[in-house]
Amino acid sequence: MTIFNAVDKFTMMSGDRVKIKDLLSSRLTECGWRDEVRLLCRSILQEKGAISSFTVEQLVTEVTPRARSLVPDAVKKELLIKIRTIFDENEDDDIDPEDA
Amino acid sequence: MPTSAAPVPAVAAQSPTTRKAIANNFRELTKDPKKLDEAANQLYESLLEDAVTGIFIEVHHLRKIGNLSALDGVAEESAHRICDVPNLDIFGVSTAKKAIDCTCPNCDRLVAAARFAPHLEKCMGMGRISSRIASRRLATKEGTSASSNSSYVHSGANAGGTDDEDDVDWSSDKRKKKSTQNSRNNGSKKNNGKTF
């Protein structure tokens, strides 16, 4: 988790996290992933909504893996490449002020 | 789990050392391409998780408000479908004009429904104009001589034809003049009113 923490903090600090997040959400909206997941949630709710013990947490655990697999490969690849380029850029950028 | 946005300003504002530490951590990480890949994947996963959570919140909100079912909409009933058959209107009713005729209870003539009310008014001598005509007719009947009456009948034959024929024209079976006697009488009534 330390790797992730470092990355997370760093991207937040540089403001790249917001950029990537915006890109991802716009891509997901474009390809209809949002609607698909929303539909999935609704169909599950229609099945199990009547059960009073059905909680939001249960819904989340049920939908999240499926939602993850629903993401188109193209979007995932684009995002990963984008993240990598941002990492590379930051690597170059930050060395200079550090040294100076 | 991705940390929330709240601690970011705190981290950034704390001191240059923490900033430096974060940058250092990151730089160390970038040296190892394997770790970098892992980091990229993790970042992607966390962002995706954020997106899913956003949808959950949205759906949850809609559900609590009661708008979730509204999104589904209501299935269109076949009864309300627009009918697309030739010669039928959108409700599936024939477009052919149905002529509705009414039989006048006073003179037993068939009159088109649209003309029935004016006809009845005239035929039964009711209404503003008709009653005026009727009262004048009563007044004239007392005072008129036989010679003047005959002249009215003659002049009425010319003018009366058009007036009474309205009813006949509008009647759907297009009956022609029922009787000359009838039109003459009607015409004379009308004409009486006009001349006075």
Swiss-Prot record, chain A:
Question: Pfam families, per this entry?
Answer: EnY2
Asked if the keyword Magnesium belongs to this entry, the reply reads no
Q: Which domain of life is it from?
A: Eukaryota
Q: Which GO terms describe its biological process?
A: heterochromatin boundary formation; mRNA export from nucleus; poly(A)+ mRNA export from nucleus; positive regulation of transcription by RNA polymerase II; protein transport; transcription elongation by RNA polymerase II
Q: Could you tell me the keywords of this UniProt record?
A: Activator, Chromatin regulator, Cytoplasm, mRNA transport, Nucleus, Protein transport, Transcription, Transcription regulation, Translocation, Transport
Q: Which InterPro entries match?
A: TF_ENY2 (IPR018783), TF_EnY2_sf (IPR038212)
Q: Per its record, what are the GO molecular function terms?
A: C2H2 zinc finger domain binding; chromatin insulator sequence binding; TFIID-class transcription factor complex binding; transcription coactivator activity
Compartment(s) = Nucleus, Nucleoplasm; Cytoplasm
The principal localisation class reads nucleus
Q: Could you state one GO cellular component term attached to this entry?
A: nuclear periphery
Provide the assembly information.
Component of the nuclear pore complex (NPC)-associated AMEX complex (anchoring and mRNA export complex), composed of at least e(y)2 and xmas-2. Component of the SAGA transcription coactivator-HAT complexes, at least composed of Ada2b, e(y)2, Pcaf/Gcn5, Taf10 and Nipped-A/Trrap. Within the SAGA complex, e(y)2, Sgf11, and not/nonstop form an additional subcomplex of SAGA called the DUB module (deubiquitination module). Component of the THO complex, composed of at least e(y)2, HPR1, THO2, THOC5, THOC6 and THOC7. Interacts with e(y)1. Interacts with su(Hw) (via zinc fingers).
Its job: Involved in mRNA export coupled transcription activation by association with both the AMEX and the SAGA complexes. The SAGA complex is a multiprotein complex that activates transcription by remodeling chromatin and mediating histone acetylation and deubiquitination. Within the SAGA complex, participates in a subcomplex that specifically deubiquitinates histone H2B. The SAGA complex is recruited to specific gene promoters by activators, where it is required for transcription. Required for nuclear receptor-mediated transactivation.
Q: By its UniProt entry, which HAMAP family does this protein fall under? A: ENY2_Sus1 (MF_03046)
Tell me the protein's name: Enhancer of yellow 2 transcription factor
To which species is this protein native? Drosophila persimilis (Fruit fly)
What are the top taxonomic ranks of the organism? Eukaryota, Metazoa, Ecdysozoa, Arthropoda, Hexapoda
> Coding gene?
e(y)2
From Swiss-Prot, chain B:
Q: Which residues form a coiled coil?
A: none
- Subcellular localization, per the record? Nucleus, Nucleoplasm; Cytoplasm
Cite the residue spans of the region called Disordered. 140-196
Q: Which UniProt keywords apply?
A: Activator, Chromatin regulator, Cytoplasm, Metal-binding, mRNA transport, Nucleus, Phosphoprotein, Protein transport, Transcription, Transcription regulation, Translocation, Transport, Zinc, Zinc-finger
Modification Phosphoserine, positions: S172
> A Pfam family in this protein?
Sgf11
Q: Which InterPro entries match?
A: SAGA_su_Sgf11 (IPR013246), SGF11 (IPR051078)
Q: What is its main location?
A: nucleus
- List the biased-composition ranges (Low complexity): 182-196
What are the annotated GO cellular component locations? cytoplasm; DUBm complex; nuclear pore; nucleoplasm; SAGA complex
One GO-annotated biological process of the protein: protein transport
Polar residues composition bias: residue spans: 142-153
Q: Does the keyword rRNA-binding apply?
A: no
Task: List the Gene3D superfamilies.
Answer: Classic Zinc Finger
**Is Transmembrane a UniProt keyword of this protein?**
no
A GO MF label: zinc ion binding
Q: Where are the zinc fingers (SGF11-type)?
A: 102-123
Q: Any domain commentary?
A: The long N-terminal helix forms part of the 'assembly lobe' of the SAGA deubiquitination module. The C-terminal SGF11-type zinc-finger domain together with the C-terminal catalytic domain of not/nonstop forms the 'catalytic lobe' of the SAGA deubiquitination module.
What is its quaternary makeup?
Answer: Component of some SAGA transcription coactivator-HAT complexes, at least composed of Ada2b, not/nonstop, Pcaf/Gcn5, Sgf11 and Spt3. Within the SAGA complex, Sgf11, e(y)2, and not/nonstop form an additional subcomplex of SAGA called the DUB module (deubiquitination module). Interacts directly with not/nonstop. Interacts with the AMEX complex component xmas-2. Interacts with Cbp80; important for promoter recruitment of Sgf11 that is not associated with the DUB module.
Which family does the record assign? Belongs to the SGF11 family.
Instruction: Explain the purpose of this protein.
Output: Component of the transcription regulatory histone acetylation (HAT) complex SAGA, a multiprotein complex that activates transcription by remodeling chromatin and mediating histone acetylation and deubiquitination. Within the SAGA complex, participates in a subcomplex that specifically deubiquitinates histone H2B. The SAGA complex is recruited to specific gene promoters by activators, where it is required for transcription. Required for nuclear receptor-mediated transactivation. Binds independently on SAGA to promoters in an RNA-dependent manner.
| Protein name listed in UniProt | SAGA-associated factor 11 homolog
Please name the taxonomic classification of the source.
Eukaryota, Metazoa, Ecdysozoa, Arthropoda, Hexapoda
Q: Which gene encodes it?
A: Sgf11
